[in-house]
Amino acid sequence: MGWKYLLSDIEIAQQCKMKKITEIAASLDITPDELELYGSYKAKLADSLEKRLADKPNGKLILVTAINPTPAGEGKTTTTVGLGQAMPKIGKKAVIALREPSLGPVFGVKGGAAGGGYSQVVPMEDINLHFTGDFHAITSANNLLCAMIDNHIQQGNALDIDTRRIIFKRCLDMNDRALRNIIIGLGGQTNGVPREDHFMITVASEVMAILCLANDIDDLKERLGNVIFGYSRKGTPLYARDLKAVGAMAALLKDAIKPNLVQTLENTPCFIHGGPFANIAHGCNSVRATKLSLKMADYVITEAGFGSDLGAEKFFDIKCRYAGLTPNTVVLVATVRALKYNGGVKKEDTTIPNVAALKAGMVNLEAHIQNLQTFGVPVVVAINRFSTDTDEELAVLKEFCTAQGAEFAISEVFAKGGEGGVELAKKVVASCEKPQKFQCLYELNTPIKEKINALATRIYGADGVVYSPAADAAIKDIDALGRSNLPICMAKTQYSLSDDPNKLGRPKNFVINAATVRLCNGAGFIVVETGDIMTLPGLPAVPAACSIDVNNDGYISGLF
């Protein structure tokens, strides 16, 4: 596949000839007064655009998801971008809708999250770092509420807040394990009331979820007001609106709620907006960006985080349910190396040809195909090809996918850009014409434990669910509040269908361990934290940050 592999992602991105964002906007019939420019290559979209396009018909909605990944990831965003670049090559107008990267994994493991090779969104450095400031605004709004909680306690505590039952956490957009559990208010009376507190990463914040699910400012304010931040000493739930925090929080978010427009290396328009993780949050870009993109293109390609057991399930059961969206096709990204890994091969040996291990690991692919078919949407399996994949291995995969009732395409968009995704694009377009009977996994009025059990048994393959005393108590509290009719957002490891990252393939004879359950009343879902999941990750032994630098001319290196 040639010399192109010698260039890093950031080198490829820096050599790209970007068009001015006004040109990209013009290709979508967006007028200059409907753009809010952030330099020459980034823009936010004005609210007036949404109103102008309200009556236009929607294009086709394509979701890109994946099997359970190796720690390196399997190229889901790369495939999403590459497919978007391939669509114009077969005469189709396409828009891509992605999440914004978090600084946590950028400086932790990934080193960047804007696609890879010749299928990237640009300006890559800006997107991976501060971008248009959305995450800063979300972090600020979240922490404003936290500051107002502790200030209220300090100023006399008229709401009788029980400091042992404050459930709303501070956040920051960084991997920093030292802040998971802290004591605040030390240093005497003038420095606040001492209590235990916690940080989570911004992408797991309820404010992030609210921004991504809100339709407009009024909806945003209503959801912010419904946030339950804690309980009084009598056990009464306390809301953000009780602190009169909603107006100021919404003011901080007034620009962040507007979708961002950028482009790919091949100038395909891309909306990047919102960024909840799929393992500890609902894992989808904003409803506003998705709905807006559907008014502008024949095909909208979006992605949901990690494997289909996490991101895709939440896309269907949370995002599509709330937004009234109907997906036309799902692209399931898999790699030969990940299937070998799921077949028991060590990570460092996955590039060695091994058909037996591939076949052993295909049970994981089988589970994901069957899970997606449960939702009634046609499936196209996209094999993200690596140079070490053999023809024999690819032939085995094609035969297997066909037997499962799924379409199959080889994707080479990393090395070839849109040209490497033409086969996939043709399969996806044809798949979008197939009849689909989209349905969610469960009805909202089903009891909480039955909804959790449906996810555990039908999607993960578990025998059942074991609840901690704390989880049981939380479910009773949610029932008592009359909020049991909300969708479930499972917080679970991305590396396994189970809640144990070491159980690869298609595990059998296991249970899901529900450690904690919490109500995200403003976002409108119930989070179930399983296993040892952390809502504030830590950095690895050698963080990606160690390789990132900037020279005197402002050129950044080390983002990959």
UniProtKB/Swiss-Prot annotation:
Transmembrane segments: none
GO biological process, one term: tetrahydrofolate interconversion
EC number: 6.3.4.3
Keywords of the record: ATP-binding, Ligase, Nucleotide-binding, One-carbon metabolism
Binding site for ATP: 70-77
UniProt pathway: One-carbon metabolism; tetrahydrofolate interconversion
Record field: catalytic activity: (6S)-5,6,7,8-tetrahydrofolate + formate + ATP = (6R)-10-formyltetrahydrofolate + ADP + phosphate
One annotated GO molecular function: formate-tetrahydrofolate ligase activity
HAMAP family (alphabetical): FTHFS (MF_01543)
Family to which this protein belongs: Belongs to the formate--tetrahydrofolate ligase family.
Name the UniProt record assigns to this protein: Formate--tetrahydrofolate ligase
Organism: Methanocorpusculum labreanum (strain ATCC 43576 / DSM 4855 / Z)
Classification lineage: Archaea, Methanobacteriati, Methanobacteriota, Stenosarchaea group, Methanomicrobia
Gene name of the encoded protein: fhs
